[in-house]
Curated annotation (Swiss-Prot):
It comes from Caenorhabditis elegans. Its main location: membrane. Forms a receptor complex together with receptor ilcr-2, which upon activation acts as a modulator of neuronal activity. Binding of the ligand ilc-17.1 to the ilcr-1/2 receptor complex triggers a signaling cascade that activates the downstream signaling components actl-1, pik-1 and nfki-1, and results in increased neuronal activity in RMG interneurons in response to input from oxygen-sensing neurons. This leads to increased animal movement and promotes aggregation behavior. The chain crosses the membrane at residues 419-439. The gene is ilcr-1. Component of a heterodimeric receptor complex composed of ilcr-1 and ilcr-2. The receptor complex interacts with actl-1 and ilc-17.1 with the interaction being mediated by ilcr-2. Keywords: Cell membrane, Glycoprotein, Membrane, Receptor, Signal, Transmembrane, Transmembrane helix. This is Interleukin cytokine receptor-related protein 1. GO terms for molecular function: interleukin-17 receptor activity. Residues 26-418 are extracellular. Residues 1-25 form the signal peptide. It is a single-pass type I membrane protein. It holds the Pfam family Ig_ILCR1. GO terms for cellular component: plasma membrane; plasma membrane protein complex; receptor complex.
């Protein structure tokens, strides 16, 4: 009756709660065969609890209090024994040194002891209790598992004669999903002085059980017979996880705490966060973690107990309004603070905290089967150590004897002067060594810096720094693009392609659209120089370029756009010279049929844009192309693709676009050209024919007959000229003075042209020339002299020679026709040859 009294049961419950952790287990899949290496590999933070992590507890030790001889020897299948247990922990009570045990994890199918005869079995256990407790984790270790489920399993064995046969207990824990974990308890070392008292056995774990699941605990008394296994079972539902409660509950904390209490509040235990000891001011500062809001606790009582844990020395009440809140790892944590003052030194004290079980309206917050009671959390004993006082020092003055001091100085050869000199010398030596080391390091660093500064810079980022690329890069490659102006969409694609070569691959690209200033200044010079200065020539094949080349080769009427552009004629002039370039690259856009390739370059490798763009770039730069230049989104390359897409859409919408936008143009004859486009010849070079019809019907004579005919005609003209000169002198009457010759019309000067021809024939006879000097030879001589007259002429530049031989000479001819030919001091023969003399006077030849 005494054992079953309510007071004793409450005291026993609190006693069991205050006890330490009995065992720490592995997860459900732990077996006897794998428990030993698993326990050795687990870190101490997983197996052992820190001093500030659990309240109340003390860290388990890896050996029993009795030593190895008390370890249970587990037998497996009768094959032998295992000397070393898989896991042995000290589960003794901190307040009761007489309680001891030894625990092993085994396989559920293992036989610990051999079977005994029937009737030799120990009695089965009774009064099995499963007490789950929700404990908050301390030491600021707030993570996903803010709370820990601590479960205590306790039972008793009846005091019978058969109890002497008891050697061990086998504890089987059946968890969810059919997972089982088994333990064996050695009770052979248990000594009970009073045979009338039945001992109570206790098993606790912090990791074996989970929140919100049903567990069945079966206790088997060992050894057992083949016919009977004395065992007892108990089932318990674990409380819900406080961290997951706010997700499940829709009501607020105030609504949950109105008029009722949480049934799981009696299973919650607090924990200490920090405990500070200040011996100088005799103060102990504690911080404890409060319960979640769903438990509805309104006040907490902090206590300071003596070393026995029974006498309360100090206490205080902390309300929920006085709690502080911190955010740790994204989770709100509430804790309370209190300072215990006037603490006695060198005395063991136990801090404790317990929630107040009643609310302000008097209802019970910790409802239990036997009444209203909350769990108290006790910490391990702490002590304020007394601080020892330093030894006292005397401030009294003493008389000194000069002789004694002198004797002391003589005994000690080292004086403060010696120390000062020695210290100065050492400092000087160290300074000199540091300076020398610094200078040496500086020289070494400077030499390395000079060596590192000698390197070759890659000014063209289009090339990668690979071994196949020369260290000394060439100058930027000049590229000329020759294309036909077929349509606005084709021109846009060519322009985007040129921008891609210029901006992405860093090439010096020349295009007629970009060189319009040079074209307007001198088209012929641009066409010639653009071919000469280009390292590479890119010919873009298209349908318009193909037909223009074919018709020009077959000498058929040309083809051009109905609405011509200012640069449409550039292709016809530039293509002939471009085909003579040593480095010609042929390409076409993807919308152009490969059959429209020029017949002169169809033997070359054809590049399709943009499909063969990287291969074409390698041919242009003569270096390996880098694909990363077009990796990702490139705005210039996207513009090229968009232009090609627009051209494709244009072709699909109008398949007959080329026939609709182009037409054939017949070649115009010279007579059809406008008058202002023809440069007139000087009068002396014009052929004068009196009867054009007769001139056209003239017969061809042999060269001998032609010479005789010209000789007879020359004699006749000389006679006529002499008679006219005499008549002219008679009319003038030989009056003295200068003779002024007025400019006459071309008809008056016609007779004067014959002496010029006669003089030329005389010169031809003297030089033994087979044919008469033509007009073309005279113009070429004039052009040669004009070239030497040009101050800006560069004899080594083909462009300047071309310009001086064509356009500049035409300007000189215009000046000759427009300028009056007057010279009063010239005689009649020079007047007949005024054009030639005028040229000589302009050039400066006398």
């Amino acid at each position: 009756m005494f054992l079953h009294s309510p007071a004793l049961l409450i005291w026993l419950f609190l006693f069991c709660l205050a006890g330490p952790q009995a065992v720490r287990t592995e997860p459900y899949n732990s077996t006897s065969s794998s428990s030993s290496p698993t326990a050795n590999d687990v870190t101490s933070s997983d197996l052992l609890l820190l001093a500030s992590e659990e309240t109340p507890t003390r860290a388990p030790k890896p050996v029993t209090k009795q030593g190895k001889k008390n370890v249970v020897k587990v037998k497996k299948g009768g094959n032998g024994t295992v000397d070393d247990s898989p896991w042995v922990t000290d589960c003794s009570e901190p307040l009761n040194k007489d309680i001891s045990c030894s625990v092993n994890i085994i396989g559920c199918s293992d036989n610990v002891f051999k079977y005994v005869d029937a009737g030799q079995e120990p009695p089965r256990a009774h009064d099995v209790r499963i007490a789950p407790t929700t404990k908050v984790m301390g030491a600021n270790r707030i993570d996903k598992r803010k709370h820990r489920l601590h479960v205590d399993v306790s039972w008793q064995i009846p005091q019978l004669e058969a109890s002497t046969h008891l050697k061990a207990f086998k504890l089987i824990v059946n968890g969810p999903d059919g997972k089982n974990t088994c333990f064996v308890f050695n009770v052979t070392q248990t000594h009970v002085d009073d045979e009338g008292i039945s001992p109570r056995y206790r098993f606790s774990s912090n990791t074996l059980f989970d929140f919100g699941h049903n567990y069945t605990v079966t206790i088997v008394s060992l050894p057992m017979s083949r016919k009977r296994a004395p065992k007892v079972s108990a089932t318990s539902l674990m409380p819900d996880d406080p961290d997951a409660a706010p997700v499940k509950i829709v009501k607020t904390n105030e609504q949950m705490c109105e008029g009722k209490s949480n049934p799981q509040a009696s299973k919650w235990a607090a924990s200490f966060r920090k405990i500070f000891l200040f011996s100088a001011i005799r103060l102990i500062q504690i911080e404890f973690l409060a319960a979640p809001p769903q438990y509805c606790f309104e006040e907490y009582e902090v206590r300071l107990l003596d070393s026995s844990g029974i006498v309360m020395l100090q206490s205080a009440i902390i309300t929920k309004d006085e709690l502080r809140t911190e955010i740790i790892n994204g989770r709100p944590v509430q804790f309370g603070e209190f300072n215990f003052t006037d603490i006695e030194l060198d005395t063991d004290l136990i801090p404790s905290v317990i929630p107040i079980e009643s609310a302000h309206d008097g209802r019970c917050l910790c409802v239990t089967e036997n009444g209203c009671s909350c769990l108290a959390a006790d910490w391990k004993p702490v002590k304020l150590t007394r601080i020892e006082k330093p030894p006292a020092t005397s401030n009294q003055t003493e008389e000194s004897d000069g002789k004694a001091e002198k004797d002391k100085k003589e005994d000690t050869t080292w004086t403060w002067h010696t120390y000062a000199i020695t210290g100065g010398a050492i400092i000087a030596i160290l300074f000199i060594l540091s300076v020398c080391a610094g200078l040496k390091c500086y020289k070494k660093f400077n030499n390395k810096k000079k060596a590192s500064n000698i390197h070759l810079l890659n000014e063209n980022p289009a090339f990668s720094h690979s071994g196949s690329i020369p260290l000394i890069l060439k100058q930027s490659i000049s590229v000329l693009i020759v294309y036909s102006h077929d349509s606005a969409q084709h021109e846009a694609a060519v322009l985007a392609f040129a921008e891609l070569l210029r901006d992405v691959f860093n090439l010096n690209v020349h295009l007629d659209v970009w060189d319009e200033d040079d074209i307007e200044e001198n088209r012929a010079e641009y066409i010639n120089s653009s071919i000469v200065r280009a390292n590479k020539v890119i010919i873009i094949n298209s349908i318009g370029a193909y037909f223009r080349t074919v018709f020009r080769h077959q000498r058929e009427p040309a083809i051009e756009r109905i609405t011509t552009g200012r640069n449409d004629v550039i292709f016809d002039m530039q293509c002939e010279l471009a085909l003579q370039h040593p480095c010609v690259i042929s390409c076409h856009f993807s919308y152009t049929n490969p059959k429209y390739v020029f017949f002169p370059i169809n033997r070359l490798l054809q590049y399709s844009i943009p499909n063969s763009l990287m291969t074409m770039t390698t041919a242009l730069t003569e270096q390996p192309a880098r694909p990363e230049q077009l990796a990702g989104f490139n705005q210039v390359f996207a513009r090229l693709q968009a232009a090609i897409s627009r051209k494709l859409n244009y072709i699909e919408s109008d398949p007959q676009w080329f026939e609709n936008t182009h037409h054939r143009v017949a070649t115009r004859r010279v007579s059809e050209l406008e008058a202002h486009n023809i440069v007139p010849l000087p009068p002396s070079l014009e052929v004068k024919v009196e009867d054009e019809d007769a001139f056209g019907q003239m017969e061809t004579l042999p060269i001998d007959e032609l010479k005789e005919k010209f000789a007879a005609k020359r004699d006749l003209e000389v006679e006529v000229l002499d008679s006219e000169d005499v008549k002219l002198l008679e009319d003038v009457k030989c009056a003295p003075g200068p003779i002024h010759v007025e400019p006459t019309e071309p008809e008056v000067l016609e007779p004067a042209e014959e002496p010029m021809e006669e003089a030329e024939e005389d010169e031809e006879d003297e030089d033994d020339v087979d044919s008469v000097e033509g007009q073309t030879a005279r113009i070429e001589e004039l052009q040669r002299l004009i070239v030497h007259k040009d101050m800006n002429h560069d004899s080594g530049n083909l462009d300047s020679a071309y310009v001086s031989g064509s356009d500049f000479s035409a300007d000189i001819h215009n000046e000759i026709l427009d300028k009056p030919r007057l010279n009063a001091e010239m005689d009649l023969r020079k007047a007949n040859r005024e054009d030639s003399a005028f040229h000589d006077e302009v050039i400066g030849i006398h």
